[in-house]
């Protein structure tokens, strides 16, 4: 008796095969908009306790898959587990977000440990193994890390700020010290991503949430080049690794990003100009995105129009339906269901 070959629609798109109905998932799909997430988060204690409890991290990873039937699960974790594994103090204050001991001078950068302790991240790898064992074979499992520039913005400032200008300023005033942070994060990210692949991840995503704040010259130096080095480093060990880049706010620099980094797909935010993306990006790599997350609060005809616009803009090429950034805590479950139903009904 021959065994039926299982295909993963998500992987198919990234590998070069367009789908009539695009695969879909949402950034931050495991989150506070879900009552089951909030219950598990309370059970865990703190946010980091949830990240480092393999059983509970696996549970919240699977919750949106059970509820919405997405084509991909992304492991529940945080981009700041890498600084944690580098020996930096990382904590999450309720209502205030992440806090770290800032690396805001060359002398302080000199105290940065250059070697990542992957043992500290074993709970993440165990959570990946659990999720892999419980996911349907056609569902893709995504591992991830933060891009070096974005992670560095938190390490330099010691927290999130409105525009993350402390890191940008350090890059101008002390480029050597800032480059050391980036170099450490590049090497650490390569090792972390490789371990995620070993633990069962099918695809990797590199989140450069703050890359778009950089001018073009600095974008090349601090966003494109570090991402290129990570992609190259991962593929040196795993030549077939599938990697998605997300340089949020890159805009007109998206073509340069995909050309020079070597990513297989790029996630775009809702401000990206559709024709430019179709002509200069989607002809070369798969495109992921790009519904405005606020439409999952608004709902109604505005949401329907937003979904239709994304499908119209990108369905002719390789496309993964997603948001332009993470879903917000005040998003409506009913509106997510409305979005899912509309995307699933589409045939292009």
Curated annotation (Swiss-Prot):
Keywords: Cytoplasm, Decarboxylase, Lyase, Porphyrin biosynthesis. Substrate binds at residues 28-32, 78, 154, 209, 325. CDD domains: URO-D (cd00717). Pathway: Porphyrin-containing compound metabolism; protoporphyrin-IX biosynthesis; coproporphyrinogen-III from 5-aminolevulinate: step 4/4. The keyword Lyase applies. It is found in: Cytoplasm. Its main location: cytoplasm. It comes from the Bacteria. One of its GO terms (cellular component) is cytosol. Its EC number is 4.1.1.37. The keyword Lyase applies. Pfam families: URO-D. It catalyses: uroporphyrinogen III + 4 H(+) = coproporphyrinogen III + 4 CO2. One of its GO terms (biological process) is protoporphyrinogen IX biosynthetic process from glutamate. InterPro entries: UROD/MetE-like_sf, Uroporphyrinogen_deCO2ase_HemE, Uroporphyrinogen_deCOase. GO terms for molecular function: uroporphyrinogen decarboxylase activity. Transmembrane segments: none annotated. Signal peptide: none annotated. Catalyzes the decarboxylation of four acetate groups of uroporphyrinogen-III to yield coproporphyrinogen-III. NCBIfam families: hemE. This is Uroporphyrinogen decarboxylase.
């Amino acid at each position: 008796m021959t065994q039926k070959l299982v295909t993963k629609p998500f992987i198919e798109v990234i590998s070069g095969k367009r789908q009539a109905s695009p695969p879909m998932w949402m950034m931050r799909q495991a989150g506070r908009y879900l009552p089951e997430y909030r219950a598990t988060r309370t059970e865990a204690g703190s946010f980091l306790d949830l990240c480092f409890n393999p059983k509970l991290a696996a549970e919240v990873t699977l919750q949106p898959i059970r509820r919405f039937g997405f084509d991909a699960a992304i492991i529940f974790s945080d981009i700041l587990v890498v600084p944690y594994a580098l020996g930096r103090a990382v904590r999450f204050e309720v209502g205030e977000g992440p806090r770290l001991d800032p690396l805001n001078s060359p002398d302080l950068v000199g105290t940065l440990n250059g070697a990542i302790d992957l043992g500290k991240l074993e709970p993440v790898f165990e959570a990946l193994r659990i999720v892999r064992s419980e996911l349907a074979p056609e569902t893709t499992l995504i591992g991830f890390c933060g891009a070096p520039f974005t992670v560095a913005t938190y390490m330099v400032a010691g927290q999130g700020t409105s525009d993350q200008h402390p890191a940008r300023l350090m890059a101008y005033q002390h480029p050597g010290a800032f480059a050391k942070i980036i170099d450490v994060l590049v090497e650490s990210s390569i090792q972390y991503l490789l371990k995620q692949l070993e633990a069962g991840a099918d695809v990797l995503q590199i989140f450069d949430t703050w890359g778009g704040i950089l001018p073009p010259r600095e974008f090349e130096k601090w966003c494109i080049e570090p991402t290129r080095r990570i992609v190259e480093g991962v593929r040196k060990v795993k030549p077939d690794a599938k990697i998605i880049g997300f340089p949020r706010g890159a805009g007109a620099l998206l073509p340069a990003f995909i050309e020079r980094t070597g990513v297989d797909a790029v996630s775009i935010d809702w401000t990206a100009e559709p024709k430019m993306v179709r002509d200069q990006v989607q002809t070369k790599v798969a495109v992921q995105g790009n519904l405005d997350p606020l439409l999952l609060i608004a709902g109604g005809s505005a949401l329907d129009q937003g979904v239709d616009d994304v499908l119209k803009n990108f369905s002719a090429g390789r496309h993964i339906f997603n948001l332009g950034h993470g879903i917000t805590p005040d998003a409506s479950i009913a509106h997510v269901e409305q979005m899912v139903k509309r995307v699933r009904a589409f045939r292009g």
